[in-house]
Every structure is written in C-alpha cells, then in structure tokens.
C-alpha cells in the first residue's frame, strides 16, 4: 500500500481508530483493531489481531498479520474486495454483500458468513 496514515504501536490491547480510510491509504495496528468509520475501495487496514469495523468495509483487510490463524474480520457492512487472515489470502470473496459478515479461517480457507448474535 502507498501511505500509512495511522499506526498505533504501544502494547497488546485493542486499538481504536475513527474516521474514513481513503483510497491509497493504510491503517495499521500491532494488536486488535476497532475502526469506527469506513474503509473505501482502494484503502487497506491491517492488524496483528482481529479487525472490527463499525461501518462499511469496501477496501482490503488483513487480520492476523502476526501469524494468528484464530484472527477474524467483522464489519457491519461487509463489502471487502480482498481479505487475508494470517498467511491465507482471498481475492474477491463470494458472500452476501451489504450485511454484517465475519471472515474466519478454517482448514486453511477463508470463509465469510453472516454474523448472527447468539445470546
């Protein structure tokens, strides 16, 4: 990616970011990432841990960048172009667009499923 516009490398807790990640920009976190805002097409977010987007994910998302195969990507409006978890990449994933979805890694393959709350 071209330009890192934000990073937050302090300790292992979740990092909170707010705003829109615009095309050509990249936001990184050395732990879990919580983003309140949107990720536009052509933008990228990357976290060592899990990624949760309270907004629309239209760009690229990389979770588990530190090798965690248990990491996941969750977005309220999941419309990602490319996703990666640990060392597994999935381009133009097939799923129901425009809803709350969660990407997980299982048997070395990324699955994207509708996120349902079970309480």
List each language-model region with its residue ranges:
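Well-ordered beta-strand positions
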Residues: 26-28, 44-46, 104
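A short, contiguous structural element within a folded domain that forms the immediate neighborhood
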Residues: 18, 23-24, 30, 36
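Extracellular beta-helix/beta-solenoid repeat scaffolds
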Residues: 45, 55-56, 71, 78
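Short, T/G/N/S-enriched strand-turn elements that build extracellular solenoid repeat scaffolds
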Residues: 21-24, 39-44, 61-64
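Surface loops and adjacent helix of pleckstrin homology
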Residues: 38, 56-57, 88, 115
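Intrinsically disordered, low-complexity terminal regions
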Residues: 1-23, 64, 69-119
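Short, catalytically relevant binding-site loops at active-site mouths
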Residues: 34, 41, 52, 59
